[in-house]
């Protein structure tokens, strides 16, 4: 991909990118929701650079697909393709605080040491049963179905636990044919199941009171502030595109709630 993108809603295709089928599925599943472009500055719609050595340079492509709907403040896909160095899809749905909905989060990362893959419907108010109970009752059977097919990803840091549900599906799998098979046979259908449930919740969601909306906003801000501060992609993006671009991307696109309003 070298042609400049004109809109965040413009179809996004990156050559040889492992996660293209996942993004294509998500974009297709969202189509019935009357999508509108989400404002993203041109330098974040598509950015290219090189990594590797002078003798063996590797092309890096970082691109953003994004939209919004009446119930979803921001839907965005951060996409990175850098050959053997990295292949990433970070797909997040940020709901409007006018609706009592969790976040949808998918982090699909391929690095030289293996694949790190995570799916969740992340709560804005984890200790609030009104926010979580009905979601978790429907999420846990899906989680249990796919958890038994995948190796565990390891412990969650204590400080991160408020931002993940009991249905957090987190796995580390090896590169090569074994990992490829697990991605095709377990990770891909799990991604579809998690997204399907999320879109069902969006369809069913009804507008909440201004008081409830304020509570949800406070919870969302805690989540996005934490994610912006602890974003594990910061080092990789800085290496590829520099610190100034990376900080602007993290705070102005990926986790922009403090800069935007409904």
Swiss-Prot record:
Biological processes annotated in GO: phytochromobilin biosynthetic process
Enzyme nomenclature, EC number: 1.3.7.3
Keyword Oxidoreductase: yes
Pfam family, one: Fe_bilin_red
Keywords of this entry: Oxidoreductase
Highest taxon in the source lineage: Bacteria
Enzyme class: oxidoreductase
Reactions listed under catalytic activity: (3Z)-phycoerythrobilin + oxidized 2[4Fe-4S]-[ferredoxin] = 15,16-dihydrobiliverdin + reduced 2[4Fe-4S]-[ferredoxin] + 2 H(+)
Function: Catalyzes the two-electron reduction of the C2 and C3(1) diene system of 15,16-dihydrobiliverdin.
Xref: NCBIfam families: PRK13249.1 (NF009722)
Protein known as: Phycoerythrobilin:ferredoxin oxidoreductase
